[in-house]
Structure formats: C-alpha cells, structure tokens
C-alpha cells in the first residue's frame, strides 16, 4: 500500500467518526441536500458558488470560513488532502471541496488531441481513453474535468479546433457523449469517476475570422441545427455539468445569455446540472460592454442561472447586496447551491471526501499506454500513398529521417497537457531507431530546423548527402503544440517556417519522400504536396506517438483514420466544409473559370457563372470523411428496407463491406442523406451514421444502420423543429464525396 493511500485511509477513518447531522444514508438525495441547505448561512451559500485557483493567496482562510465551493488547478495529492481537510474538519459545516482540472485528452498518460480522436471514428476507443484519463485524474484527487469540448467549428485558423471533434454535429455529439460515459462511468459515485463538463455553451467555435474569443454572429437555424445538437447528445448521456462560453452570441455575452441558459437549457431542456462560468467570464461582461460594473455582471449571471463563478469575484462581493436591493431572491442562490451540493453528494464526497481507500492503478501503466498507442494508430489519416510507397518495404536498407518533429517529446503531446510530461513521451525517432535496428536498416537523422517555425535550414549539405545515399526519406513536418489551443489562432495555416523549402530541397534528389505531419489543426501544404509520395497525418498523437507511428509506417498496422474536418487548399477558402448549401449557381469542374485561362480584356458577363474562386476553385484539398488504407475495400449490396417512410419510422440501411486487399485493415462506412426540397434550403449532405469495421483480407461483413427519421429534421422559418415529407437521397460510402446513392421518401 502506497504512502498516499495509507494517509487517505487514516483520513477517511477519522472523517467517518465525525457527526454530520445532514448525512443520513436512509434519506434520499434531495432530503440530504435540503437538510444541509437549511443549516447554511447566506455567506456559506454564496461560498458554494465560488471557485478559486489553487494558488489563491487567501485560499486557506476562505476554505475555513466556508467561502469556497470548488478549487481548480491543484493536483498535488498531498495538497489536495490538506485543503480538503481544511474544508471538512475546520469549516463550520464540513462541506467538502470539489477539485477541478482541465483533463482534456489524458492526465499523465496523454492521448491524441480530441480532433485526432474524432479522426479515429471509434466511439468505443474514445470512451475507453476517457476512462483512462478519469482514473488517473481521480487518483490525484480531481473529481471534475472541464471537458469534453464540443464547440463545432468550420475554421482551422481557430486554435481551439484541436480540442473539439471537428465540423460535424453528429461527430461532436457522439464523441462528446463517449467522453461523458468514459469520465462518469457507471456512476458518479464510483471513486474513479469524474464529473464531465461539456463546453462551451454556446457557439464559441463560431468566432469571426477564427480569432479566439471573437464575436459569434450566427443565424438561428445554424445555432439550433448545427451548434446545439451536440449538447443535447451529451446531456442525454448524463453530463453532470456544463460551462458557458467567452464569446458573445448576436450581441449578448454567453455567460449572461438568459434566453439561451435559463429559457432553453434550464426550462426547455430541463438541465438540472451545474453551470459554471469560464475563467472570469462573469466580470468580462463588463469588458464586452454589456454591463457597467461587477455588480451588474453578477446580476446578469445569476439571472442566466450561472451556478458557479470561476476565478473572478462578482458573486462573493455582490450577491448579498443584490438580495438586499431586491434584484434577486435568496431562493435563486438556494437553487444554485442545491445543484452544487447535489453533485458533491452524487460524487460521494460527503461519504469519502479524501479519496478512495483502495489502490488506484498506477499512472502510465501498461494498459493505459496501450490505449494511448491504439488511439494514436487509429487516429492517423493516410492522405496520400503514391505507388504504395507505404508501408515501408522490407527491401529498404537505408533511411534518413528529417525534421524537428521527429524528436519533439513536448510538442507531440499537443495542447492542454497540464499533467503530461515530455520525459514520459516516446518520440517517433526513438521508435524508428529501435525498429530499424531490429530490421538491420541503417538510419540517419537530421533535425534540419530548430523548431517548426525556424526559417533557416541547418546542415543543408549533410542532409542532401545522406538523402542521396538513402533508399527513402521520412520527413516529419507540422507545428509545435503551442501553435494551437486557446488564444493560439493563426491567420496563415501553411506549414510554418522553412518547412516547405525543406520539402523542396529534399525532393530535388529524387528519392521517395514520405511526410508524417504532426499538428493541432489542418495545415495547408498544397505547394509541396506533389513532391511527397505519401502523407500520413498524425495530428498531435500524445505519449505513445513513437510506437504508433513506427507501426504505421512499417505496416504492423494499417492506417484507418478518416478526416473529421475538411482540409482547405488555401486559407482563403475558409470556411469550407462538407455540409454546405448548394446555392443557386453550384460550381462544377466544367464551369470553373480558371484564373490563368482568362483572356486579356475579356468582357465581364453574368451568364453561366458559378460559385467558385478563380484561383482555387471550389473543392477542398481533402474532403471530410476521407482517409486511405494499406488495403482496399468494396461496398456493395446497399439496400433500404422500404422506400416510403412515415415520420418516426426507422430508416434501415444495409450494405456488404469486403476487404479486397492484402492487409488486415479497418474501414469506416459512412451514411449521408440529403433532403431535395425543404421549407429552408438543406445541406448537400449530412452525416447520419457510421461504423468502423476491421476485416482480414477477402473477408466480408454485413453492416446494418438504423436511423430514426425524427433525426432528419431541422428548424423551419418559424423555428419549429420539423421533419418534412418529400424526397431524400442517401449515400453509403467511405467519405463525404464517395458513396452509393439510393432514394427514399418521407410521407405524411
């Protein structure tokens, strides 16, 4: 038994002997909450609505006085135990603290970034990864995580695209729900569970220009049909809490948006969980120009039913005064306190505030590392593979590895890794060296650039000399972890620094060149794409990047990832996304008037024009849902059970998937629909279902999808959710651009 666990056990035994009149296991939860609330002073009630950072200078005093309900960013188990003892043993009522942390994609074992997890299209694996993260975090005293982030975005300039699940409502909802299930397990009371906090409610990913914290001007139809559906999914999965957003939505800051929070979330959706502000977003309403002072900010937040204020001081300073002024009632505070206390009871903090008395699994244990490795493998997307240069041939005798991201243990972890450590990370270079040695391959390495942003190539001649002697070049390109994440947006998403020049230099030799790209967003590299024989997009893969990438390059496993977001050819195409509208002048390759083909002084005409860019056309570099494999697959025998359906019926779609190649591999079968005519124009395609299936060569699998026709609806011009009768197309395929098309009709 570890020293920490022994201390926790002794603390638990001491606490179990304390007399707490409001704890009675025979009472139902509501009675326990009401009994405790009845004993609380107004100061103690307001204290439950206050969350402070772990380094707050008056932390101990506030805890002892009952002035804090939650502490974030404290993960030292000894310190967590110390402050929890202050709350339980020194404050008047002994109400335990709720310890919170941003556990975004792993705790000590770092998983691929969430955008990469979405590229796996494997819900079971992502849920398992969230279980790993929850278990490790809970072992250090954390019982509340500010994740998953389900801010749907169509703009890769936005740095926080790395934290979400891409551009599609279904993917964001399904993967968000998988994380909720993984965090919260079978019960919040499970000591290895942590409360999930889907964020940011809402439209944070709609930031103008992809610039973080920027204004979100969004139509009602996009808000209700694109942005909000993922939140419905995570709340159906039982998410215990949610967090507001920094942005304003059509002129009202999200943290004070009563129509969105009180009227929709609370009253219409009946969400009974805790709503927490983002960091200082309550007092930032004054900076927005929406409130005059912190007192008015506290009023707006309370009217919007914000239960807990993170970091700023409006609640603790002004709520008592607002009650005295008659602006709010004490009942408003009581309602918020009840929700917070209920969560603490559900987490078992009153029964055992000091943690579980049994041993937790070790951080970074083999099972956890294997989950991280598998996820890194399944999330990598093979974008190009000319002449089947991958997997690497057994005939290769010499390899040269080039690029700073081949050996960047910190950067491979990605954004938001508070508790990950670079010394635990295994880099691609380390794993490639080990594999090359085992296979008798000579391997040379050149960093070439100090960082991904460096503008000068180091050792050009030495690189060229080794490339000339090599059978193949492995380039590692991309971006450092600091270039994505919160407040790290980019106007230019090209490969940074001299990376394009590095590709061009290496390609002049004429040897096969394979690029592995590690990044927190889609990056643009069309200029050098023709020079690359293969491109493996590995995102920021986490702790086990090295073993995962080495296995992929050498063919131990086949890539099976699919893009959860559209890759533009040029930043000027943004926003570009698969589920766009058709417009009245849809473009085709035949109607694309190319810039270089326009005659001099040709007259301007409006006849026959279509929606495209003269220089970059209308198509992306790589479409949503796209991803290659070392094998090949055939989808056949696509059928619909019944071509005429009533609203509420199940749309049953089946297909036969066959592995027609020579590698064991997984394929993601995707189902899309399109409503031909509606009371609002409808997207050209919308993802409705998907399955990932692993098959050996020559094996087949019958796949069946059941889609509820109620899910095919949208909000009409009167903002009523409707499923309209009419003709629909349906596609079953392997990306948003390729599939077998059938039709069905919804009748009255």
Q: Which residues does each predicted region cover?
A:
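Sec-dependent signal peptide recognition
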Residues: 2-10
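Repetitive helical segments and hydrophobic/amphipathic motifs
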Residues: 12-15
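Glycoside hydrolase catalytic-domain context in secreted enzymes
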Residues: 17-716, 722-736, 747
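Edge beta-strands of extracellular beta-sandwich domains
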Residues: 740-744
């Amino acid at each position: 038994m570890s020293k920490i666990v022994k201390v926790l056990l002794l603390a638990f035994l001491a606490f179990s002997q304390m007399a707490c009149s409001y704890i009675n296991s025979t009472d139902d939860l509501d009675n326990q909450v009401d009994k405790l609330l009845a004993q609380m002073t107004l100061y103690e009630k307001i204290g439950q609505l206050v969350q402070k950072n772990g380094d707050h200078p008056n932390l101990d005093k506030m805890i002892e006085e009952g002035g804090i309900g939650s502490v974030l960013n404290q993960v030292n188990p000894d310190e967590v135990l110390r402050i929890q003892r202050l709350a339980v043993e020194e404050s008047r009522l002994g109400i335990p603290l709720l310890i919170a942390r941003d556990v975004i994609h792993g705790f000590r074992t770092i998983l691929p970034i969430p955008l990469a997890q979405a590229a796996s299209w494997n819900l079971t694996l992502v849920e398992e990864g969230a279980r790993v993260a929850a278990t490790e975090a809970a072992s250090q005293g954390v019982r509340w995580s500010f994740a998953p982030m389900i801010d749907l975005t169509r703009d890769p300039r936005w740095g926080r695209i790395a934290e979400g699940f891409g551009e599609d409502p279904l993917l964001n909802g399904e993967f968000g729900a998988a994380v909720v299930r993984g965090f919260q397990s079978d019960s919040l009371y499970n000591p290895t569970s942590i409360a999930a906090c889907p964020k940011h409610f809402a439209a944070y990913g709609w930031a103008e220009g992809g610039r973080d914290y920027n204004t979100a001007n969004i139509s009602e139809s996009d808000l209700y049909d694109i942005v909000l559906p993922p939140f419905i999914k995570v709340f159906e999965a039982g998410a215990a809490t949610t967090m507001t957003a920094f942005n304003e939505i059509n002129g009202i800051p999200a943290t004070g948006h009563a129509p969105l929070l009180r009227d929709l979330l609370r009253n219409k959706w009946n969400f009974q969980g805790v709503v927490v502000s983002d960091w200082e977003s309550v007092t930032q309403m004054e900076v927005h120009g929406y409130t005059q002072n912190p007192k008015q900010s506290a009023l707006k937040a309370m009217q919007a039913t914000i239960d807990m204020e993170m970091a700023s001081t409006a609640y603790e300073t002004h709520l008592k005064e607002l009650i005295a002024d008659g602006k709010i009632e004490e009942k408003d505070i009581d309602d918020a306190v009840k929700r917070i206390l209920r969560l603490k009871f559900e987490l078992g903090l009153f029964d055992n505030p000091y943690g579980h008395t049994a041993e937790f699994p070790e951080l970074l244990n083999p099972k956890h590392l294997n989950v991280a490795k598998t996820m890194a493998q399944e999330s990598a997307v093979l974008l190009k593979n000319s002449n089947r240069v991958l997997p690497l041939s057994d005939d290769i005798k010499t390899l040269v590895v080039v690029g700073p991201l081949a050996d960047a243990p910190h950067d491979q972890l990605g954004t938001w890794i508070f508790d990950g450590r670079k010394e635990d990370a295994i880099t691609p270079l380390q794993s490639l060296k080990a594999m090359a040695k085992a296979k008798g391959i000579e391997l040379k390495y050149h960093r070439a650039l100090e960082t991904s942003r460096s503008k000068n190539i180091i050792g050009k001649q030495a690189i060229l000399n080794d490339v000339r002697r090599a059978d193949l070049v492995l380039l590692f390109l991309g971006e450092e972890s600091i270039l994505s994440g919160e407040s790290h947006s980019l106007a230019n998403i090209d490969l940074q620094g001299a990376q394009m020049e590095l590709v061009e230099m290496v390609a002049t030799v004429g040897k096969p060149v394979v690029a592995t790209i590690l990044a927190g967003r889609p990056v643009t590299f069309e200029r050098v794409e023709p020079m690359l024989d293969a491109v493996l997009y590995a995102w920021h893969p986490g702790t086990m990047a090295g073993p995962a990438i080495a296995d992929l390059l050498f063919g131990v496993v086949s890539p099976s990832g699919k893009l959860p977001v559209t890759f533009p050819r040029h930043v000027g195409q943004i926003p570009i996304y698969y589920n766009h509208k058709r417009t009245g002048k849809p473009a085709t390759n035949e109607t694309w008037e190319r810039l270089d083909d326009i005659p001099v002084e040709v007259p301007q005409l409006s006849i026959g024009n279509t929606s495209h860019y003269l220089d970059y056309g209308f198509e992306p570099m790589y479409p949503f849902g796209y991803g290659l494999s070392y094998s090949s697959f055939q989808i056949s025998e696509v059928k619909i059970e019944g071509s005429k359906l009533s609203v509420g019926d199940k749309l049953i779609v089946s297909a036969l998937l066959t592995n027609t190649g020579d590698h064991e591999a997984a394929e993601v079968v995707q189902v899309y629909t399109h409503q031909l005519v509606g009371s609002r124009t409808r997207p050209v395609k919308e993802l409705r279902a998907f399955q990932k299936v692993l098959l050996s060569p020559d094996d087949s699998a019958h796949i069946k999808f059941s889609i509820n026709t109620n899910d095919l609806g949208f909000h009409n011009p009167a903002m009523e959710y409707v499923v309209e009768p009419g003709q629909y197309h349906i596609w079953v395929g392997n990306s948003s651009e390729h599939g077998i098309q059938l039709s069905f009709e919804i009748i009255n």
